[in-house]
Amino acid sequence: MTKVQELKKHLRPGQVYRREDVARWSNAVDRHLKQLVEEGTLTKLAGGLYAYPKETVFGKAPPEDDKLVEAFLKDDRFLLASPNAYNGLGVGTTQLYDKTVVYNHKRHGDFQLGGRRFAFRVKPSFPKSLTKEFLLVDLVNNVDQLAESKQEVLARVAERAASCDFRRLEYATRNYGNVQTKKFFANALKPGAELNAD
Protein backbone atom coordinates (compact mmCIF):
# COMPACT_ATOMS: atom_id res chain seq x y z
CA MET A 1 0.00 0.00 0.00
CA THR A 2 1.43 3.39 -0.99
CA LYS A 3 1.63 6.36 1.36
CA VAL A 4 -1.08 8.17 -0.63
CA GLN A 5 -3.44 5.19 -0.25
CA GLU A 6 -2.73 5.16 3.50
CA LEU A 7 -3.48 8.87 3.62
CA LYS A 8 -6.81 8.36 1.81
CA LYS A 9 -7.96 6.05 4.63
CA HIS A 10 -8.05 9.09 6.94
CA LEU A 11 -10.06 11.28 4.57
CA ARG A 12 -13.88 11.35 4.65
CA PRO A 13 -16.17 12.50 1.80
CA GLY A 14 -17.91 15.79 2.49
CA GLN A 15 -15.18 17.06 4.81
CA VAL A 16 -12.89 20.07 4.47
CA TYR A 17 -9.24 19.81 5.48
CA ARG A 18 -6.50 22.32 6.16
CA ARG A 19 -2.96 21.51 5.10
CA GLU A 20 -1.95 20.97 8.73
CA ASP A 21 -4.81 18.46 9.21
CA VAL A 22 -3.40 16.30 6.40
CA ALA A 23 0.18 16.78 7.66
CA ARG A 24 -0.64 14.54 10.66
CA TRP A 25 -0.97 11.57 8.31
CA SER A 26 1.73 12.36 5.75
CA ASN A 27 5.51 12.70 5.73
CA ALA A 28 5.43 14.56 2.37
CA VAL A 29 2.24 16.57 2.74
CA ASP A 30 2.66 18.96 -0.21
CA ARG A 31 3.50 16.20 -2.66
CA HIS A 32 0.63 14.03 -1.42
CA LEU A 33 -1.85 16.92 -1.56
CA LYS A 34 -0.76 17.70 -5.12
CA GLN A 35 -1.26 14.03 -6.10
CA LEU A 36 -4.70 13.89 -4.46
CA VAL A 37 -5.78 17.09 -6.25
CA GLU A 38 -4.46 15.86 -9.61
CA GLU A 39 -6.30 12.54 -9.32
CA GLY A 40 -9.51 14.32 -8.27
CA THR A 41 -9.78 12.94 -4.73
CA LEU A 42 -9.37 16.42 -3.22
CA THR A 43 -10.39 19.82 -4.54
CA LYS A 44 -8.33 22.88 -3.67
CA LEU A 45 -10.65 25.58 -2.30
CA ALA A 46 -8.11 28.23 -1.27
CA GLY A 47 -4.50 28.38 -0.10
CA GLY A 48 -4.05 25.49 2.34
CA LEU A 49 -7.75 24.51 2.24
CA TYR A 50 -8.98 21.32 0.54
CA ALA A 51 -12.30 19.49 0.25
CA TYR A 52 -12.99 15.80 -0.27
CA PRO A 53 -16.23 16.12 -2.28
CA LYS A 54 -19.11 13.70 -1.84
CA GLU A 55 -20.15 11.84 -4.96
CA THR A 56 -23.82 12.29 -5.86
CA VAL A 57 -25.89 11.20 -8.84
CA PHE A 58 -25.32 14.71 -10.23
CA GLY A 59 -21.53 14.63 -9.75
CA LYS A 60 -19.29 15.96 -7.02
CA ALA A 61 -21.08 18.00 -4.38
CA PRO A 62 -19.34 21.07 -2.91
CA PRO A 63 -18.71 21.09 0.83
CA GLU A 64 -21.36 22.48 3.15
CA ASP A 65 -20.82 26.12 4.07
CA ASP A 66 -20.54 25.44 7.80
CA LYS A 67 -17.78 22.84 7.31
CA LEU A 68 -15.96 25.12 4.88
CA VAL A 69 -16.08 28.13 7.21
CA GLU A 70 -15.16 26.07 10.29
CA ALA A 71 -12.03 24.75 8.56
CA PHE A 72 -11.13 28.22 7.28
CA LEU A 73 -11.53 29.86 10.69
CA LYS A 74 -10.21 26.91 12.72
CA ASP A 75 -13.12 27.74 15.02
CA ASP A 76 -16.73 26.61 15.34
CA ARG A 77 -17.97 29.87 16.87
CA PHE A 78 -19.58 31.67 13.92
CA LEU A 79 -22.98 32.46 12.44
CA LEU A 80 -23.78 32.15 8.75
CA ALA A 81 -26.24 34.77 7.55
CA SER A 82 -27.27 36.29 4.25
CA PRO A 83 -29.00 39.53 3.28
CA ASN A 84 -31.41 37.21 1.41
CA ALA A 85 -32.81 36.15 4.80
CA TYR A 86 -34.27 39.66 5.20
CA ASN A 87 -36.69 38.86 2.36
CA GLY A 88 -38.59 36.42 4.61
CA LEU A 89 -39.31 39.10 7.22
CA GLY A 90 -42.02 40.78 5.12
CA VAL A 91 -40.46 44.25 5.31
CA GLY A 92 -40.23 44.96 1.58
CA THR A 93 -36.77 43.62 0.80
CA THR A 94 -36.69 41.59 -2.40
CA GLN A 95 -33.11 41.74 -3.71
CA LEU A 96 -31.02 38.57 -3.99
CA TYR A 97 -27.38 38.76 -2.95
CA ASP A 98 -24.63 36.35 -3.97
CA LYS A 99 -22.64 36.38 -0.75
CA THR A 100 -22.88 34.82 2.65
CA VAL A 101 -22.06 36.90 5.72
CA VAL A 102 -20.07 35.11 8.42
CA TYR A 103 -20.21 36.70 11.87
CA ASN A 104 -17.20 35.48 13.85
CA HIS A 105 -14.54 36.46 16.40
CA LYS A 106 -11.40 36.06 14.23
CA ARG A 107 -11.46 37.21 10.59
CA HIS A 108 -12.69 40.30 8.78
CA GLY A 109 -12.84 40.76 5.02
CA ASP A 110 -14.24 39.30 1.83
CA PHE A 111 -12.92 35.88 0.82
CA GLN A 112 -13.53 33.55 -2.11
CA LEU A 113 -13.67 29.95 -0.83
CA GLY A 114 -14.44 27.12 -3.21
CA GLY A 115 -15.85 29.54 -5.79
CA ARG A 116 -18.28 31.14 -3.32
CA ARG A 117 -18.12 34.62 -1.79
CA PHE A 118 -18.05 35.01 1.97
CA ALA A 119 -18.05 38.33 3.82
CA PHE A 120 -16.40 37.72 7.20
CA ARG A 121 -17.37 40.24 9.89
CA VAL A 122 -15.83 40.31 13.36
CA LYS A 123 -18.53 40.86 15.97
CA PRO A 124 -18.17 40.75 19.75
CA SER A 125 -21.39 38.77 20.05
CA PHE A 126 -23.97 37.03 17.87
CA PRO A 127 -26.59 34.33 18.48
CA LYS A 128 -25.98 30.63 17.85
CA SER A 129 -28.71 30.60 15.19
CA LEU A 130 -30.73 33.12 13.17
CA THR A 131 -33.91 34.39 14.80
CA LYS A 132 -36.53 36.79 13.49
CA GLU A 133 -35.50 39.34 16.12
CA PHE A 134 -31.81 39.10 15.26
CA LEU A 135 -32.59 39.47 11.55
CA LEU A 136 -34.62 42.63 12.21
CA VAL A 137 -31.75 44.11 14.22
CA ASP A 138 -29.19 43.02 11.63
CA LEU A 139 -31.30 44.52 8.83
CA VAL A 140 -31.39 47.90 10.58
CA ASN A 141 -27.63 47.64 11.27
CA ASN A 142 -27.06 47.14 7.52
CA VAL A 143 -29.94 49.15 6.02
CA ASP A 144 -27.55 51.53 4.23
CA GLN A 145 -26.08 48.60 2.25
CA LEU A 146 -29.44 47.44 0.88
CA ALA A 147 -30.77 48.34 -2.57
CA GLU A 148 -34.31 49.11 -1.35
CA SER A 149 -35.60 52.47 -0.11
CA LYS A 150 -34.26 52.98 3.40
CA GLN A 151 -37.30 54.88 4.72
CA GLU A 152 -39.83 52.36 3.35
CA VAL A 153 -37.91 49.41 4.79
CA LEU A 154 -37.52 51.10 8.19
CA ALA A 155 -41.25 51.92 8.32
CA ARG A 156 -42.07 48.25 7.69
CA VAL A 157 -39.46 47.11 10.23
CA ALA A 158 -41.16 49.30 12.84
CA GLU A 159 -44.53 47.69 12.00
CA ARG A 160 -43.00 44.22 12.21
CA ALA A 161 -41.24 45.09 15.49
CA ALA A 162 -44.60 45.91 17.08
CA SER A 163 -45.72 42.30 16.46
CA CYS A 164 -42.51 40.71 17.82
CA ASP A 165 -41.90 39.34 21.29
CA PHE A 166 -40.82 42.54 23.08
CA ARG A 167 -38.29 40.85 25.39
CA ARG A 168 -36.58 38.92 22.60
CA LEU A 169 -36.40 42.01 20.38
CA GLU A 170 -35.06 44.11 23.26
CA TYR A 171 -32.43 41.43 23.99
CA ALA A 172 -31.39 41.26 20.33
CA THR A 173 -31.21 45.06 20.08
CA ARG A 174 -29.17 45.41 23.27
CA ASN A 175 -26.70 42.64 22.38
CA TYR A 176 -26.39 42.89 18.59
CA GLY A 177 -27.47 46.39 17.56
CA ASN A 178 -25.20 49.31 16.79
CA VAL A 179 -25.91 52.73 18.33
CA GLN A 180 -28.27 53.86 15.52
CA THR A 181 -30.14 50.56 15.64
CA LYS A 182 -30.64 50.84 19.40
CA LYS A 183 -32.04 54.36 18.97
CA PHE A 184 -34.28 53.22 16.11
CA PHE A 185 -35.85 50.37 18.11
CA ALA A 186 -36.15 52.50 21.26
CA ASN A 187 -38.26 54.92 19.17
CA ALA A 188 -40.04 52.23 17.16
CA LEU A 189 -41.42 50.55 20.24
CA LYS A 190 -42.87 53.82 21.60
CA PRO A 191 -46.39 54.59 20.34
CA GLY A 192 -46.58 57.53 17.90
CA ALA A 193 -42.81 58.02 17.67
CA GLU A 194 -41.12 59.19 14.47
CA LEU A 195 -39.06 56.45 12.88
CA ASN A 196 -35.59 57.37 11.77
CA ALA A 197 -32.29 55.50 11.83
CA ASP A 198 -30.17 58.62 11.20
Which positions does each model-derived feature cover?
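Short beta-edge/loop segments at beta->alpha junctions of small alpha/beta modules
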Residues: 1-74
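Alpha-helix initiation and N-capping motif
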Residues: 1-4, 30, 65-66, 82, ...
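Basic Lys/Arg-rich amphipathic helical interaction modules
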Residues: 6-9, 113, 170
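Charged, low-complexity, helix/coiled-coil-prone segments
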Residues: 22-34, 72-84, 95-100, 123-132, ...
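Short coil/loop linkers at secondary-structure junctions
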Residues: 28-29, 92, 177-179
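Short gly/ser-rich loop at a beta-strand->alpha-helix junction or flexible surface loop bordering the NTP-binding
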Residues: 44-54, 68-114
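A short, charged helix-loop
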Residues: 114-122
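Hydrophobic alpha-helical interaction segments
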Residues: 123-198
